[in-house]
A protein has these predicted regions:
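Repeated scaffold domains used in trafficking and secretory/extracellular systems
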Residues: 28-35, 77-84, 128-140, 177-185, ...
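Asp-box/WD-like beta-propeller blade repeats and closely related beta-sheet repeat scaffolds
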Residues: 111-141
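A short beta-strand motif characteristic of beta-propeller blades
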Residues: 12-27, 67-73, 122-129, 167-174, ...
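Loop/turn-rich, solvent-exposed surfaces of beta-rich toroidal or solenoidal domains
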Residues: 173-213
Length: 236
């Protein structure tokens, strides 16, 4: 049941400005939400800062109630984006420097349990991993991290990585269409791509039966649903 999601108040939004100022929920007011994922305990939302030298944010909300718990201050000067949970760690895309940040789930649980409801600087507590493609969005499925690169016009690629022995190992590469902002897998392997570009053009949710179907014909999804502009990450 995701009915509570309509009540989540993300720090940095116009409706939360008073609380943000009083409780110091964010490092600056120029925040732009980008990614979302869920765990058994939390809803996690990323936001990058458009202010030079300011840090991005990872907001943590209680999954049962939607209550805001804490904000993790992330790396400076990064276009903080897609986010995924692999059961042990949370992975966050940093497209500007072509890295993924890994946050141990226990670290997030420890901060969330305190219910500080404020910004906590975590810039020195998180490890980075270089990847072979610019990470725009990410998801976890069947033991692998799938990292997709957004392009404006031409078809792009999505690379599957395995995390083993403290390293990310490239396993396979798939073709994807342009403008991909989010990716998610259903349990049966069906793939959902959120595609968008620009504030005045429609977004589209593109559905593929399998990875092989996506790779074979990236511009011909089995289903395409028109949506409002500016769709970003998608989660199931």
């Amino acid at each position: 049941d995701y009915s509570f999601l309509q009540h989540i108040e993300i720090p940095g939004m116009p409706s939360t400005r008073e609380e943000d100022r009083l409780e110091k929920r964010i490092s600056d007011t120029n925040q732009c939400p980008q990614g979302i994922c869920t765990t058994d305990d939390y809803v996690l939302v990323t936001a990058y800062s458009a202010t030079k030298d300011a840090v991005g944010s990872l907001h943590v909300f209680d999954k049962e109630t939607g209550e805001y718990l804490v904000t993790l201050g992330m790396k400076k000067k990064s276009h903080l984006g897609g986010i995924a949970f692999d059961g042990n760690s949370v992975w966050v895309c940093h497209s500007d420097n072509q890295t993924l940040e890994r946050i141990p789930y226990g670290f997030i649980q420890g901060l969330a349990a305190k219910r500080q409801k404020t910004y906590v600087d975590c810039t020195k507590s998180i490890k980075e991993y270089k990847v072979g493609n610019r990470p725009s969005c990410i998801t976890y499925y069947n033991g692998l991290l799938y990292v997709a690169t957004e392009t404006q016009f031409l078809n792009s690629q999505m690379i599957a990585y395995e995390f083993e022995d403290e390293k990310l190992k490239e396993k396979s590469i798939y073709r994807i269409p342009s403008k991909v902002q989010g990716v998610a897998f259903a349990e049966d392997g069906t793939i959902y791509l959120s595609t968008s570009y620009g504030r005045t053009k429609s977004s589209y949710l593109k559905v593929y039966d399998s990875l092989s179907a996506l790779d074979l014909k990236p511009t011909k999804p089995q289903m395409k649903v028109e949506m409002p502009p500016c769709s970003e990450e998608v989660t199931i």
